[in-house]
Every structure is written in structure tokens, then in C-alpha cells.
């Protein structure tokens, strides 16, 4: 399975995972308490510049953003239908800035670093007896590993339909995608159980 991580030595790469995660959280909070279009536009510009420094070729960088652009387009459409354009622009700018920064963080942080950092941050929650930090880290790692794989599989199924001359419809692609994804999930669950990765205290 592919990772979203990009090898490099940019400033974003050199930042510690904790600094990046905390900065992303703070950035998100600031975005969602602000309604200033100028400030939000500036945040989009800053996030775009940071994303441009991760070391991806322009073509691949834009390709990675395609699902993000589709999400933003849907959000923009719904907001424009029900709100004046100024009000509709606020959530669009927020989402764009946040997704660009999140893309920068995932491109400059390995999955192992993510898991280790989230597990460490979640460790104090174990005192409640309701959560296991290792499980939280494992769940995040699996999500980060599976997202690009699911996107690639969707594209492969789509191309296979085109090659056979079949009409490409989201509904016709969804069933095989779900089946293959569930099979992968079963295989991963079996591997986790076989290796006794989940460690619960008695």
C-alpha cells in the first residue's frame, strides 16, 4: 500500500510531528472562529505556499489535490445555493486552507511518526480506562495507509470499466470498491490478531 509521505528536507519535513499536529489544530481553530475574507484568503495563500514546498512535481501535487478540489466544489455549490456569495465564500476558504495545510502535514510526516505521536498524546487518556492509546494510534495509521489505496483502487476500477466499454457510473464502481476494501480490512484484521498487535491490559 502506498503512503502519502514525500521524501524531502524542507522546513516542513524538519519540523517535529508534534509541532505540525499542534500547529494544524491551532490553524483549524483560528480558521473556524474567523469570518474575515481577507484573513481567510491569506490563510489559503500561506497553506498553498507551504504545500508547494513539500517537493512534489506540479503535476503530482495537483493530482493529489483532485479529491480535495471535488470536495471544495461540492461545498461551494451548496453554500452558493443557500447563501449570498460573501457568506458562501467563508466556509470554502476555511476548508481550502485547512485541507492544503493537512495535505502538507501528511506529505512531510511518515505514518510511523504519526502513529507514535498520536499514541503519545493519547496516553494520558488511558487513565480513564475507556480508551487504549495504542488502538488510537493503530486506527489512525490504518486510515492513513488505506486512504491512498482506496483512491488508487477506485481509479483502477474506473479505468477497467472504460477499457471494457462500460458506462462509468459511481453506483457501478462503488460495489466492487466496497467489496475489495472489506476484503482488505478482513486481511488486515486477521494479520493484527495473528501478530497480537493489540495489547490490552487485563
UniProtKB/Swiss-Prot annotation:
CDD domains: EcfT. Its main location: membrane. Induction: Expression is repressed by biotin. Coiled coil: none annotated. Keywords: Cell inner membrane, Cell membrane, Membrane, Transmembrane, Transmembrane helix, Transport. Pfam families: CbiQ. It is a multi-pass membrane protein. The chain crosses the membrane at residues 21-40, 44-63, 68-90. It is found in: Cell inner membrane. The keyword Transmembrane helix applies. GO terms for cellular component: plasma membrane. The keyword Amino-acid biosynthesis does not apply. PANTHER family: PROTEIN ABCI12, CHLOROPLASTIC. Involved in biotin uptake. Part of a biotin transporter complex composed of BioM, BioN and BioY. Belongs to the CbiQ family. This is Energy-coupling factor transporter transmembrane protein BioN.
Amino acid at each position: 500500500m502506498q503512503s502519502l509521505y514525500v521524501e524531502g528536507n524542507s522546513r516542513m519535513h524538519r519540523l517535529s510531528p508534534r509541532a505540525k499536529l499542534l500547529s494544524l489544530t491551532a490553524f483549524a481553530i483560528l480558521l473556524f472562529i474567523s469570518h474575515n475574507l481577507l484573513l481567510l484568503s491569506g490563510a489559503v495563500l500561506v497553506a498553498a505556499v507551504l504545500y508547494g514546498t513539500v517537493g512534489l512535481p506540479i503535476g503530482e501535487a495537483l493530482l493529489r489535490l483532485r479529491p480535495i478540489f471535488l470536495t471544495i466544489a461540492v461545498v461551494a455549490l451548496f453554500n452558493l445555493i443557500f447563501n449570498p456569495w460573501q457568506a458562501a465564500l467563508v466556509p470554502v476558504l476555511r476548508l481550502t486552507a485547512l485541507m492544503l495545510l493537512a495535505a502538507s502535514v501528511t506529505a512531510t510526516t511518515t505514518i510511523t511518526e504519526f502513529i507514535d505521536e498520536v499514541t503519545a498524546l493519547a496516553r494520558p487518556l488511558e487513565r480513564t480506562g475507556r480508551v487504549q492509546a495504542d488502538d488510537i494510534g493503530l486506527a489512525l495509521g490504518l486510515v492513513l495507509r488505506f486512504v491512498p489505496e482506496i483512491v488508487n483502487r477506485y481509479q483502477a476500477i474506473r479505468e477497467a470499466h472504460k477499457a471494457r466499454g462500460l458506462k462509468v457510473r459511481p453506483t457501478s464502481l462503488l460495489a466492487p470498491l466496497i467489496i475489495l476494501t472489506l476484503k482488505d480490512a478482513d486481511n488486515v484484521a486477521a494479520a493484527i490478531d495473528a501478530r497480537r498487535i493489540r495489547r490490552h491490559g487485563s
